[in-house]
């Protein structure tokens, strides 16, 4: 009998992808081939109302702790921390000691803990918060938020705007093998940890944090070739095709009005050469998602080979919505890309290129929702997610509102570990959603529970069916026509695409939500930057 099945506790595999669109997987309406993920979804529950932070590091902080990111040292990303926030409690830039991570809790309860991929929870020397120090017995990690997917940015000369990429194996300095592909490499490292622990009878907690499909857009040429003819009609056509498929799958009601596309240039205004360039970018992006699916298939096979697959609970989600920032024309990336990247058409997708998908493709991926990564609109914080395996209903779907803070308490409950607060540590704000996963409950959060967001000058708050958002002025760099620096109000039950602002029609409801947001801000210690 495999050692994992000798006891009663489940193994866990949490897979986090980076900047992936809500409809990229074919099981969510996309055209990209994702058979391995689709098979896991068919064996589990599709989570269609899962929410995160608008940006990656803050989402990861909440996943790891079950707490709001402002409470645990990650009030914002170090890369965009303002002078007003620097030195303030909650803005340390690494996971602070006032909270226990899910890896620490599981390790202390007898789990073997391992991770491979993106860390981004302490990117500044002396690296006060590294994977091993925060509960992972084995780890191979990128410390920062992005990197060249082939390892081509590990020196001062080749490092991009964030400097040379920094890697740690079990918290010790290590180099990424030049020419290896990040998605394959991280999957192989995790499988290697499986093999190293084949004689270890302890249950496992495995965390696989892909850096794909985060820019730069890079993928093996043979995979890019599979999609070179797929996107020649442009993002608007892709958006309509995905929406139609979502309706067939029951992911969007026929009455759902999709958000209006904002920013960027309409396809028909581009020259043939510009269209060809854009189509290749999206082909590379699709290849990144395809490669990620293929890597997941290898990890799942590793679980099967070890006899642990049937005992494993798998959770999968994207850390935020797709990225619509056109980095080629946006500081601080613009000047570096112009000076260092080779973005000729035939080179896009290779090690020496650096491109991004931009706002039009991103809104095809986030449809029917409003906007994308960085913003508190649904397109930025409502992400593709599912659960599969032990303790999860099969061929199911849940529309229950779920939050990334719910993952840690859910794993603790499934492991039979008391979720009660540890002495000297913060209590978790998230709730266990185990009942939603196994189909015994339809909701996890109370209908009137306050859910709030704050990041990078942006704000958001949800009460019941109502949601108010406050978009920062930076959105005007991408889409000047989008209202900024004022509160917008939407009824998500009637208008999930956030298409109709009801702020003027419902001033009392808006004030109720704004008051709720300021109560949240005081509670978690938000430092609102000057000019926000």
State each model region's role:
Residues 1-483, 487, 496-522, 526-532:
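Formylglycine-dependent sulfatase
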């Amino acid at each position: 009998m495999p050692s994992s099945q000798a006891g009663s506790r489940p193994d866990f595999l949490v897979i986090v992808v980076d900047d992936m669109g809500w409809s990229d997987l074919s099981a969510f309406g996309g055209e990209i081939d994702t058979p391995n993920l689709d098979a896991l979804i068919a064996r589990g529950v599709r989570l269609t109302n899962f929410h995160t932070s608008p940006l990656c590091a803050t989402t990861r902080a909440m996943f790891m702790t079950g707490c709001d990111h402002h409470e645990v040292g990650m009030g914002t990303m170090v890369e965009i921390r303002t002078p007003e926030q620097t030195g303030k409690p909650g803005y340390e830039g690494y996971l602070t000691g006032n909270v226990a991570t899910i890896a620490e809790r599981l390790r202390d309860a007898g789990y073997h803990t391992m991770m491979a991929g993106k860390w981004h929870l302490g990117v500044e020397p002396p690296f006060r918060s590294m994977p091993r120090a925060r509960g992972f017995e084995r780890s191979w990690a990128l410390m920062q938020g992005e990197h060249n997917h082939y390892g081509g940015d590990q020196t001062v000369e080749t490092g991009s705007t964030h400097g040379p990429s920094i890697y740690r194996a079990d918290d010790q300095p290590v180099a990424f093998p030049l020419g290896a592909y990040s998605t394959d490499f991280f999957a192989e490292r995790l499988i290697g940890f499986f093999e190293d622990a084949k004689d270890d009878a302890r249950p496992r907690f495995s965390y696989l944090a892909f850096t794909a499909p985060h820019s730069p857009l890079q993928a093996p040429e043979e995979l890019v070739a599979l999609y070179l003819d797929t996107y020649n009609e442009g993002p608007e056509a892709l958006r309509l095709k995905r929406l139609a498929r979502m309706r067939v799958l029951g992911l969007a009601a026929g009455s759902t009005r999709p958000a209006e596309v904002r920013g960027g240039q309409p396809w028909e205004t581009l020259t043939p050469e510009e269209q060809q360039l854009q189509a290749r970018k999206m082909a590379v992006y699709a290849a990144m998602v395809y490669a990620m699916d293929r890597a997941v298939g290898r990890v799942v096979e590793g679980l099967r080979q070890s006899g642990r697959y049937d005992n494993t609970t798998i959770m999968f989600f994207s850390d935020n919505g797709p990225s619509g920032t056109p980095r080629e024309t946006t500081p601080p990336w613009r000047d570096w890309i112009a000076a260092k990247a080779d973005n000729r058409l035939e080179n896009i997708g290779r090690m020496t290129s650096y491109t991004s998908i931009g706002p039009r493709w991103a809104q095809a991926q986030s449809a029917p929702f409003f906007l994308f990564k960085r913003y508190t609109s649904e397109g930025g914080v409502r992400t593709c997610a599912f659960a599969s395996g032990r303790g999860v209903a099969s061929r199911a779907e849940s529309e229950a509102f779920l939050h990334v803070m719910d993952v840690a308490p859910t794993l603790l409950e499934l492991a039979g570990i008391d979720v009660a607060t540890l002495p000297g540590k913060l209590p978790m704000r998230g709730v266990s959603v185990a009942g939603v996963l196994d189909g015994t409950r339809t909701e996890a959060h109370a209908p009137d529970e306050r859910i709030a967001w704050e990041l990078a000058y942006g704000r958001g708050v949800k009460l019941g069916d109502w949601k108010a958002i406050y978009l920062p002025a930076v959105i005007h760099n991408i889409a000047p026509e989008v209202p900024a620096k004022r509160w917008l109000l939407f009824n998500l039950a009637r208008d999930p695409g956030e298409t109709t602002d009801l702020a003027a029609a419902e001033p009392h409801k808006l004030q109720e939500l704004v008051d709720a947001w300021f109560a949240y801000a005081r509670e978690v210690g938000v430092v609102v930057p000057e000019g926000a």
